[in-house]
Regions:
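Bacterial N-terminal signal peptides
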Residues: 10-24
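N-proximal helix/coil linker or "cap" segments that precede and/or mark the start of modular domains
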Residues: 26-53, 176-178, 193
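A short beta-strand-turn-helix
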Residues: 49-70
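Short pre-active-site segment immediately N-terminal to redox-active cysteine/selenocysteine motifs
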Residues: 69, 76-79, 149
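Conserved redox-active cysteine motifs that mediate thiol-disulfide chemistry
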Residues: 75-91
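N-terminal secretory signal peptides that target proteins for export/translocation
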Residues: 1-6
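Thioredoxin-like thiol-disulfide oxidoreductase module
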Residues: 112-149, 154
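Thiol-/selenol-based redox modules, centered on thioredoxin-like
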Residues: 158-203
Length: 203
């Protein structure tokens, strides 16, 4: 028996249902993407999808930050003499603990332009991430941390609370304090680093 058009579509839909299939009778609106989960939800509100970059300049997914409990923000610049001494020491710390640690370091450039920033990251062989030069989030983070100089290192916990900032102590470089705070929080031996200002000669 030949089915008339008015009865064909309902019957076809019934067959699809019995087979466990869905008949696409009308286009549906795509479901909204779920909100990012993890740490640093408050901080990441100010970040765009391309705000964070690798040493090569490629965008890095924000999830890489959200997966880390602690965040270090490192302010530095290519033409800063003290930075030339502090940066290698920080790289040494990063390479020793990054694979097993629960932190990430984000470099914020104090250089005059993006090209100089890229040169600095390349020449220093920085292994960590960076905030894209000129990104709107830069000013917000500076205001949040009340950063007024460099080299400066700050440490935030998973709730984006500032738990360590540069300060004098035991003769260490002022920005070594956040490293010691992180070591204490993770039950690791606290290392001290005496900053030799005489080493600035020739830089």
């Amino acid at each position: 028996m030949k089915l008339r058009a008015p009865f064909a579509l309902p019957l076809l839909a019934t067959v699809f249902v019995l087979l466990g299939l869905h008949l696409p009778l009308a286009a549906q609106t795509p479901a909204p993407k779920p909100a990012p989960t993890g740490f640093h939800a408050d901080l990441l509100k100010d970040f765009k999808s391309n705000s964070i970059i690798s040493g090569s300049g490629s965008p890095v997914p924000l999830k890489r930050i959200a997966d880390k409990k602690y965040l270090f923000f490192y302010f530095s610049g290519k033409y800063c003499a003290p930075c030339k001494i502090f940066t290698p020491k920080l790289i040494e710390f990063y390479k020793k603990h990054a694979k097993t640690g629960n932190f990430e370091i984000i470099f914020i450039s104090e250089d005059p332009d993006a090209d100089t920033m890229r040169q600095y990251m390349s020449e220093a062989s920085m292994p960590w991430l960076a905030l894209r030069f000129g990104d709107p989030a830069v000013k917000k983070i500076k205001d949040r941390l009340q950063q007024k100089g460099f080299p400066m290192l700050f440490l935030l916990d998973e709730n984006d609370e500032l738990i360590a900032k540069p300060e004098l102590g035991d003769g260490d470089h002022v920005s070594w304090n956040p490293v010691k705070v992180w070591q204490k929080a993770n039950n690791l031996p606290v290392t001290h680093w005496k900053f030799d200002y005489k080493a600035l000669q020739g830089h």
